[in-house]
Amino acid sequence: MRHLYRSFCLLKSVTPLLGLIILATSCGKDPAVDPDTDGTVRIAKECTSGLKPVNIVITGDGFLEEDYATGGAFDQAANQAIDALFSVEPFKTYSAYFRVQTVTAYSEERGATLKNASTKTNTIFGVTLDGGSSTGMSGKDDKVFDYAKKAQGITATELKQTVVIVISNYVQYAGTTYSYSDGRSIAYIALSSGTSQLTRFGNVVVHEAGGHGFGRLADEY
C-alpha cells in the first residue's frame, strides 16, 4: 500500500482521535434526493451522537449509472467498506460520531486504466493503476473533491477534515492515499479479491482510509 503527500506536504503528527471526536457534538438528516441523477447524495451511515459529525464521503470510479441502483454493485462495495472500517478500533468505539455519505458518479465504462496499457478506460475520475506487482493508483483529485463537496455539509473548509474514498470498479490488490498539506485526503481503493488478511478488500479500506487518510499514519515497511 502507498501513502503519498501532495503539495510537498510534510508528515504530520497523528491527529488525536479522541480529541477530534469530542469536537463532534449534532447530526443532520438525510436530504431529499433524486436517485436518477449523477451526483446524488445518500446517507449510508448517520451519526447518532454529537452536534457536528465526523464526515467520510465515498464515491466510485468505473461504475455505470445502473451500478448505482439501490443495492447494486456500488452499494455493495460501499457497504463492505463501511462495515470493514467500523469493525476495528477506534472507529468501532466512536462509530456513533461518524456520518458516511455516498455520492453517485457515473462512468461511461466499467473498470480502470492500467498505466502502460495502449487503451484507456473511460471513467469519471480517470483512475489509473500502476499494474504488475505495484499497488499504486491515481486519479483526478480535483474532480473527486468537486464531487465530495456535493455531500451534505461538505464545504471547502469541511473538506479539509473529511476523508474521501474512491472505490475503483476493478479487481486488483491495490490502494493509494493522497494527503494534502491543507488536510484534504483521498483514498483510492480497488476491489481486491484477495482472501488473506493483508490483501482482502476490507483490510485495504482500513489501511488506506483509516490509517493513512484519517489517522495520517505512514507505512512502517
Regions found by a protein language model. Give the residues of each.
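Extracytoplasmic/secreted cell-surface and envelope-processing proteins
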Residues: 66-69, 110-112, 173-185, 214
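N-terminal secretory signal peptides that target proteins for export/translocation
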Residues: 1-10
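A cross-taxonomic marker for long C-terminal extensions/tails that follow the last structured domain
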Residues: 157-171, 175-180
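C-terminal motif of bacterial Sec signal peptides marking the signal peptidase cleavage site
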Residues: 23-26
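Sec-dependent signal peptide hydrophobic core
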Residues: 9-19
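Propeptide-to-catalytic entry region of secreted or membrane-anchored zinc metalloproteases
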Residues: 30-159, 169-170, 200
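Short pre-active-site segment immediately N-terminal to the catalytic Zn-binding motif
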Residues: 184-206
